[in-house]
A protein has these predicted regions:
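Beta-rich carbohydrate-recognition and catalytic domains
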Residues: 1-136, 140
Length: 140
């Protein structure tokens, strides 16, 4: 992790960029300069760490979580492409948008598998609930 500072204590920031010209609705990781939350160092040379080629192909509102039993890391994000997408607007996106979350997994925060879709409207019997969208997920 040559992009990371040498201090073993730091904060990790998972985020997306809103970029109407570059279609940057992809996921980025930054690490704080030690325990200073005012200075951030981008992972991966300012390039996204994960992107989506499924669903709407845009990902926003990411959340990162670690499974303490397996040590596996997960990034879970909203499946929504605003820029370069359908130009539907907030009403359309909030009432008739994707009910999928996009998921990646990694053993080390450097090597990611995925993406895969998780449809939160699907019931155990395979039928679907009437939902308008799935946004800004967080996990415990």
């Amino acid at each position: 992790m040559s992009d990371c500072p040498n201090d073993p204590y730091a904060y990790l920031l998972v985020h997306f960029l809103e970029d109407p010209d570059g279609y940057a609705e992809r996921i980025y990781l930054d690490v704080s300069d030690g325990d200073n939350p005012h200075r951030w160092i981008p992972f991966n040379g300012r390039r996204p760490v994960v992107t989506s080629d499924i669903g709407t192909t845009g990902v926003r509102d990411p959340h990162i979580i670690r499974n303490p039993q397996t040590g596996m890391w997960y990034i879970i994000a909203t499946d929504l492409r605003v820029f370069g997408g359908d130009n539907g607007g907030w009403y359309e996106w909030s009432h008739h948008a994707s009910t999928n979350l996009i998921v990646w997994q990694s053993p080390d925060l450097l090597h990611w598998e995925g993406p895969r879709m998780l449809d939160v409207s699907q019931r155990a019997d395979g039928t679907h609930m009437q939902l308008g969208m799935a946004w800004a997920c967080e996990c415990l």
